[in-house]
């Protein structure tokens, strides 16, 4: 627990010791790798000796095999040691990563706390109310500016609509009256037809005049 707390309190010795431990373990792993390479070569050499003396010098061949077996056992031990060191390196790196992650998370939490220190739900609501109020005022001002004005005369939209409807009705009435009206003049007729009709009309006038004269005489 104290190791974890050292990260939060800002102590550098724990993080530096973790890095030093990882560096030391990796150096040891490098040495073991070189040792493994050396032993592998020795095993190959002893195997060659055993094969070369398998039929001619069995005692030497057996000695080579025993030496080969000893190198193999040593190689197995080194492999086990390497596995242990690699596991330890991974564990330290994982713990170091977790600790660094926790440090970053703590800094983030502190930053959020600092940001929210002056913020409250009530304050946010009040600010939003002010914003909405100003937006409403802006809209009212925009509407007032966009409405047409003329020498202080306030235009009633309803009155204008009624006047427009009256004009439309007047035009409609004029059209209907024009459809019912008889034309004031007739189309011109040919000269011959006009002359004949005039003669008939004159005869009718003479007859009416004679009739009126006769009625006057009878009345006397």
UniProtKB/Swiss-Prot annotation:
**Single GO cellular component term:** multivesicular body
Which keywords does UniProt give here?
Coiled coil, Cytoplasm, Endosome, Membrane
Q: Which domain of life is it from?
A: Eukaryota
Question: What compartments host this protein?
Answer: Cytoplasm; Endosome membrane
Q: Report any one BP term from Gene Ontology.
A: intralumenal vesicle formation
The parts of the chain that form a coiled coil are 15-86, 153-220
Topology term for the membrane: Peripheral membrane protein
Q: Is Signal there in the keyword field?
A: no
Q: Name one GO molecular function term.
A: identical protein binding
Return the annotated region ranges for Disordered.
175-210
Q: What does this protein do?
A: Required for the sorting and concentration of proteins resulting in the entry of these proteins into the invaginating vesicles of the multivesicular body (MVB). Also required for the proteolytic cleavage of the transcription factor RIM101 in response to alkaline ambient pH.
**Family (UniProt):** Belongs to the SNF7 family.
Q: How does it assemble?
A: A component of the endosomal sorting required for transport complex III (ESCRT-III).
The name on file for this protein is: Vacuolar-sorting protein SNF7
Q: Which organism is it from?
A: Cryptococcus neoformans var. neoformans serotype D (strain JEC21 / ATCC MYA-565)
Underlying gene: SNF7
